């Protein structure tokens, strides 16, 4: 969905260009000021699933008069990139008619964002010029018969490279949180969990405290609340305090840095891994509250900005992000850089503590690279697992692949979602056989790309209902084979060894065994 925001623009002030281009947007919202805009963005982002107003499946434009609000277009765009990194949103000064040509790009931009394969392709491979704001004003193309700055259009759609470069730029700026954001009471966007707490005060703490935790059953508001509840407790235990509103701003910014439209690698997965990390820490790091806090924070940030694909796809097509990290642990380095920048801005005290401890958070995130799995398996079997750097790596690795250790009813739902994401990777590879990954998204070859079904209805069913594993297999009969492969290749030996070293974790290997037995009964012939 795409939105045109008209900020402080009265009907009489609308130019003919605005009126003529309103139909490119799914909705037009008139707001009094930029404060109201910030509230609208946050409220939309935490709407219930399926959230059509996530600002990722369409392009949104903010029209306003900078002179009225003492905030330039550039400053507002920087604010968007800083606090809403995954959003396809940009600002335009509506008082300058030549700027309004930008509206004519929206139809083509929306076609890229609404097709999940062209959207992911753009995220991963789109090339940018080197101008500070990502816009080459000398590059023009034709859209709807008019000459428009195509690079300016393309720069409005999220890419991994833009996310990374904007994050680095923010690190250099070291700007304070602007008033527009600072004055927001973030608790006001969490009405659903607050209402539930009023009825049952310990509700979220109870679900966080069990291995049967199911992040799939929670709304975005509830996921943020779970993160808030757990981190607040851990920070108090570690005596590394942060004000409630600052912690909520960090969590809202982090959620907006993940892609809601991803099936598996999203904020839901981040909360799931953080909860699993904490539960493992209660067994393995009982007397170290600072390390527990650091490791749980690494867990919630370990996949930030994840495109829902893999390192191999980035390497094979020689993406600029892959080249940036010399084809080594590409996504893990990408997540690490983004998350450390977020912490440097929102919780610098914690980042400082992390760096004093052999760059604790950085090492933990890099340990999640599955290409290194066998190395950590060897460490588990042949080294002292209580060695600090080995232990933190083992904990976050176990948490990252903990889906196969959850109860079967939960594990099967995660299996379904990762299968959908793998299917997207296969579709992306097929797409590359007909299109160069980095080619101009506004070229003619993009016009007739088939749009694959978004699977929203089936995903909603998985999230809302406790779906029986048998029903999942009926619709996706090859899931058992995929789960058996993953368990045999990565999980079984790892969790068996972990359980042998730490007897309190035997329930993990027991659950893997139970789940594998179920999948084996439903295995399809090769």
Curated annotation (Swiss-Prot):
Coiled coil: none annotated. Its cofactor is a divalent metal cation. Residues 182-526 form the PDEase domain. A divalent metal cation 1 binds at residues 269, 302-303, 400. Its EC number is 3.1.4.53. It comes from Saccharomyces cerevisiae (strain ATCC 204508 / S288c). A divalent metal cation 2 binds at residue 303. One of its GO terms (biological process) is cAMP-mediated signaling. It catalyses: 3',5'-cyclic AMP + H2O = AMP + H(+). This is 3',5'-cyclic-nucleotide phosphodiesterase 2. Pfam families: PDEase_I. GO terms for molecular function: 3',5'-cyclic-AMP phosphodiesterase activity; 3',5'-cyclic-GMP phosphodiesterase activity; metal ion binding. Keywords: cAMP, Hydrolase, Metal-binding. Monomer. Controls the level of cAMP in yeast cells, together with the low-affinity cAMP phosphodiesterase (PDE1). Belongs to the cyclic nucleotide phosphodiesterase family. The active site is at residue 265.
């Amino acid at each position: 969905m795409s939105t045109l925001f008209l900020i402080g623009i009265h009907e009489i002030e609308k130019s003919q260009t605005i009126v003529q281009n309103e139909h490119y947007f799914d909705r037009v919202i008139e707001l009094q000021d930029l404060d109201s805009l910030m509230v609208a963005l946050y409220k939309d982002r935490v709407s219930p699933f399926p959230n059509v107003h996530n600002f990722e499946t369409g392009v949104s434009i903010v029209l306003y008069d900078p002179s009225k609000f003492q905030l330039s277009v550039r400053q507002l765009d920087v604010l968007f990139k800083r606090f809403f990194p995954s959003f396809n949103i940009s600002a335009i000064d509506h008082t300058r008619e030549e700027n309004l040509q930008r509206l004519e790009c929206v139809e083509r931009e929306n076609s890229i964002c609404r097709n999940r394969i062209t959207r992911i392709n753009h995220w991963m491979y789109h090339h940018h010029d080197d101008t500070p704001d990502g816009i080459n004003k000398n590059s023009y193309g034709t859209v709807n018969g008019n000459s428009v700055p195509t690079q300016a259009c393309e720069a409005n759609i999220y890419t991994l490279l833009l996310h990374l470069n904007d994050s680095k730029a923010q690190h250099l700026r070291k700007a304070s949180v602007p008033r527009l954001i600072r004055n927001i009471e973030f608790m006001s966007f969490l009405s659903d969990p607050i209402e539930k707490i009023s009825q049952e005060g310990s509700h979220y703490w109870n679900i966080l405290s069990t291995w049967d935790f199911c992040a799939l059953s929670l709304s975005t508001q509830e996921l943020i609340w779970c993160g808030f509840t757990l981190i607040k407790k851990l920070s108090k235990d570690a005596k590394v305090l942060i004000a409630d509103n600052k912690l909520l701003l960090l969590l809202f910014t982090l959620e907006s840095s993940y892609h809601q439209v991803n099936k598996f690698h999203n904020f839901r997965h981040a909360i799931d891994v953080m909860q699993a990390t904490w539960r493992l820490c209660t067994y393995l790091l009982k007397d170290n509250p600072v390390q527990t806090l650091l490791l749980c924070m690494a867990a919630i940030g370990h996949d930030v900005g994840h495109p829902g694909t893999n390192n191999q796809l980035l390497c094979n097509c020689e993406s600029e992000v892959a080249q940036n990290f010399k084809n080594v642990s590409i996504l893990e380095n990408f997540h690490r850089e983004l998350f450390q920048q977020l912490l440097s801005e929102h919780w610098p005290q914690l980042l400082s503590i992390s760096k004093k401890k052999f760059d604790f958070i950085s090492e933990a995130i890099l340990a999640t690279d599955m290409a290194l799995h066998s190395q950590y398996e060897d460490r588990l079997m042949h080294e002292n697992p209580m060695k600090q750097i080995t232990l933190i790596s083992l904990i976050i690795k176990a948490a990252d692949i903990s889906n196969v250790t959850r109860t079967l009813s939960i594990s099967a739902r995660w299996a379904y979602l990762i299968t959908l994401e793998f299917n997207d990777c296969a579709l992306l590879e097929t797409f590359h056989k007909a299109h160069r990954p980095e080619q101009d998204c506004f070229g003619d070859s993009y016009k007739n790309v088939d749009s694959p079904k978004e699977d929203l209805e089936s995903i909603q069913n998985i999230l809302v209902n406790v779906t029986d594993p048998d029903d999942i297999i009926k619709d996706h009969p090859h899931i058992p084979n995929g789960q058996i492969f993953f368990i045999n290749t990565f999980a079984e030996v790892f969790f068996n060894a972990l359980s042998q070293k730490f007897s309190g974790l035997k329930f993990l290997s027991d659950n893997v065994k139970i789940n594998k037995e179920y999948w084996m009964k439903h295995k399809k012939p090769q």
